[in-house]
């Protein structure tokens, strides 16, 4: 063998690789010059012999007979891909050949890159290079092959695969090459029959080495065995799970999805009613990628939530499976290990048979474009810890923010300030939730501020005259009693109709009669019948008694009034709340669906029944606190009501202690009366939205919006306010 020639070739290759690495956009995806003295990662086959050949310090793969060494490679996520291979030979005779070959289809067919025959067997290496047809391919193969008599040798050496990360033509491209070390949810597991156990959510997450997907999903995903498979275990001592029918089983699953680059988008967003007696689905966008160990399949992981039917409790999880363009699909694995629910904490997990039916989805391009717009409109996000680095002189102790709530019961929390969303939370019983940006949280009674408060403020702004003083009985036909002659829309919003059973602030709300007569019934006639049945006790507008029923009646009244203006087919929630507020604000499609009565009335609950992702929460808070009810400079909410909400003064009604009030669907707390000295010389009433179990969205007077969604009955946020006051004073 011509050793000098070979060594010069190796030096030249090293110099070439040094140049390649100096180019910022070029990456070496694979290289092997066998200088390690091993080719153990190659697959050897055929008759004949192979050996490590070492001569004067240089190493190569030596083959003779009918022998070949094969290596699987991937260029997934890369363009401008180039492959080079060297082949040399000694002692060939006529009919002997040595091949360096590559395949673009997983080895089904092969292309010759270098061919060495008799007369070219001086030992010098012959190089072949190809730079076309190799881009974005997870199924590349290379091989060295001998077709010789025994003792006639082929020498394979210096395999180099390079490429440039794909940045164009694919939405949100990945930079990995598919080299992922996976110990759970492997391809063999998902295509096998082993039992699934609960595990850290990192196994469901997009890994750092993930490559762009080689397959594209568009069509229907159907699951089988939902009614008989699956596990659910209650966490804690409430022992409420036995009261839920078919609790361990998922609802039936048959939904369409569209892929956009590395993102996996459900066609149907927001809560999906279904027929399961206990749970409804919410599907969120996930990710698609390739891993070299998945045998040409692409891998999907997407978040989903189960919501309690007729109520707001929410459990968040992830589903994952493998698929190919031809409809091949693995089993689907799923896991839930966190919730926002005060009385029922559950882990769900299981594996189900799946089917993928490729199909052209109507409006797929619109779905993709809308999704890209949705993502682009999210407020820029930083981890909560960045508050300390962004405001280094403040002395803020970030660990104290959110500390009013026991960490194990916190779903999400964060702060919006100066155009940045500082986000925390997303911890589960099994690690960090991998899709925090679309973790679904229930509104509970924050809907009273949003649907009730913003809804009436919009109605007041939208039409001439005064709508907030309209009578409830004029627009809710079920309220026929004389006790409803006087209460107005705004008094229902204030929960000050004067109609109640007990004068205690929350006694009626917490009663069994309320649970049985309102929360557990499904039709508008039942809900309205109960809501209208409270007797007269005092003059409307003079006493606060917490009644979700009042907000329900307000929602019905606003809806009926809107129909009188816009036509019998009009829908206040869809037409006004979604089209005139949510969409212009850039809220997620998840927020565009409200819980409704299960009848032809389809009446939105108004006082609860909304779903948010964290970006929705900060936008809804800033809509009032920062934009004062304006969208892109246009007054969308009534300015008078906005001012009365943000600057309470002597308004509102006492709602508990002297430091608590309620007005226009918002709670208020007076910082002047707090045990911490904020330096307020006069009363400083802070409006906030509040929800059952531990939900607060606080419109702080320093321009911040603080939120926390938790489920341990801890509603206070004072420790967070103290820290945020260090960054910007509440009472300057």
What are these regions (language model features)?
Residues 26-66:
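Extracellular glycan-recognition surfaces and repeat-rich motifs
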Residues 95, 147-163:
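Extracellular carbohydrate recognition
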Residues 108-135:
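Extracellular carbohydrate recognition and processing domains
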Residues 180-202, 461-500, 533-536, 563-607, ...:
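Active-site helix/loop module of the DD-peptidase/beta-lactamase fold
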Residues 322, 392-435, 696-697, 705-707:
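A short, well-structured edge-of-sheet supersecondary motif
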Residues 388-413, 480-587, 612-618, 622-626:
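Active-site-adjacent helix/loop patches that line small-molecule binding or acyl-intermediate pockets
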Residues 442-468, 492, 554-558, 617-624:
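Active-site SXXK
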Residues 525-535, 539-544, 562-568, 591-700, ...:
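Penicillin-binding protein/beta-lactamase superfamily catalytic region
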């Amino acid at each position: 063998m011509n050793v000098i020639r070979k060594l010069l070739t190796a030096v030249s290759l090293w110099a070439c690789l040094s140049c390649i690495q100096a180019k910022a956009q070029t990456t070496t995806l694979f290289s092997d010059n066998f200088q390690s003295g091993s080719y153990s990662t190659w697959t050897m086959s055929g008759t004949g012999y192979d050996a490590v050949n070492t001569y004067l310090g240089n190493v190569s793969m030596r083959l003779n007979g009918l022998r070949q060494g094969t290596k699987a490679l991937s260029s997934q996520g890369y363009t401008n891909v180039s492959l080079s291979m060297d082949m040399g030979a000694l002692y060939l005779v006529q009919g002997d050949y040595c091949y360096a070959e590559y395949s673009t289809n997983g080895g089904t067919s092969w292309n010759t890159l270098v061919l060495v025959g008799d007369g070219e067997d001086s030992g010098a290496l012959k190089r072949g290079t190809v730079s076309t047809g190799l881009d974005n391919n997870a199924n590349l193969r290379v091989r060295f092959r001998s077709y010789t008599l025994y003792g006639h040798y082929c020498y394979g050496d210096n395999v180099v695969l390079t490429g440039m990360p794909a940045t164009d033509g694919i939405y949100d491209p990945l930079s990995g090459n598919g080299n992922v070390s996976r110990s759970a949810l492997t391809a063999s597991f998902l295509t096998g029959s082993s039992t699934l156990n609960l595990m850290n959510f990192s196994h469901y997450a997009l890994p750092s080495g993930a490559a762009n997907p080689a397959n594209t999903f568009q069509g229907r995903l159907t699951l089988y065995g939902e009614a008989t498979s699956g596990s659910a275990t209650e966490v804690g001592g409430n022992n409420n799970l036995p009261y839920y029918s078919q609790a361990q089983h998922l609802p039936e699953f048959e939904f369409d999805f569209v892929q956009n680059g590395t993102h996996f988008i459900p066609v149907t967003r927001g809560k999906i009613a279904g027929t399961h007696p206990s749970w409804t689905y919410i599907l969120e966008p996930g990710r698609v990628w390739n891993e070299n160990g998945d045998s040409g399949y692409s891998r999907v992981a997407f978040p989903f939530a189960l919501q309690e039917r007729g109520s707001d409790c929410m459990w968040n999880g992830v589903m994952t499976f493998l698929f190919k363009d031809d409809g091949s699909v693995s089993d689907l694995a799923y896991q839930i290990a966190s919730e926002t629910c005060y009385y029922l904490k559950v882990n769900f997990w299981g594996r189900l048979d799946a089917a993928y039916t490729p199909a052209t989805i109507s409006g797929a391009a619109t779905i993709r474009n809308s999704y890209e717009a949705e993502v682009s409109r999210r407020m820029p996000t930083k981890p909560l810890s960045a508050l300390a680095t962004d405001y280094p002189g403040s002395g803020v102790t970030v660990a104290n923010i959110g500390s009013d709530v026991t960490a194990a019961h916190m779903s999400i929390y964060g702060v919006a300030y100066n155009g940045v969303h500082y986000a925390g939370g997303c911890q589960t019983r099994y690690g960090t939730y991998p899709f925090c940006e679309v973790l679904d949280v229930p509104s509970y009674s924050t809907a009273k501020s949003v649907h009730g408060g913003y809804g009436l403020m919009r109605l007041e702004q939208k039409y001439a005259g005064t709508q907030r003083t309209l009578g409830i009985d004029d627009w809710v036909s079920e309220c026929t009693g004389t006790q409803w002659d006087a209460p107005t829309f705004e008094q229902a919003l204030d929960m000050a109709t004067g109609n109640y059973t007990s004068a205690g602030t929350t006694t009626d709300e917490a009663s069994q009669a309320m649970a049985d007569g309102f929360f557990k019934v499904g039709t508008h006639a039942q809900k309205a019948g109960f809501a209208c049945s409270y007797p007269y006790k005092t003059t409307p507008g003079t006493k606060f008694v917490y009644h979700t029923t009042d907000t329900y009646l307000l929602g019905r009244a606003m809806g009926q009034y809107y129909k009188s203006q816009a036509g019998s087919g009009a829908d206040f929630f869809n037409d006004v709340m979604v089209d005139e507020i949510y969409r212009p604000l850039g809220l997620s499609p998840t927020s565009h669906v409200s819980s409704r009565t299960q009848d032809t009335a389809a009446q939105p609950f108004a006082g609860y029944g909304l779903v948010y992702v964290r970006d929705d929460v900060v936008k809804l808070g800033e809509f009032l606190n920062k934009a004062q009810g304006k969208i892109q400079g246009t007054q969308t909410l009534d300015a008078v009501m906005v001012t009365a909400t943000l600057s309470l003064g002597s308004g509102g009604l006492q709602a508990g202690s002297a430091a608590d009030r309620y007005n226009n669907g918002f709670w208020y707390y007076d910082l002047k009366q707090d045990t911490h000295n904020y330096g307020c010389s006069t009363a400083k009433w802070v409006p906030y939205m509040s929800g059952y179990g531990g939900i607060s969205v606080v419109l702080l007077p320093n321009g911040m919006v603080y939120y926390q969604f938790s489920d341990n009955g801890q509603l206070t946020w004072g420790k967070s306010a103290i820290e945020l006051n260090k960054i910007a004073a509440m009472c300057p």
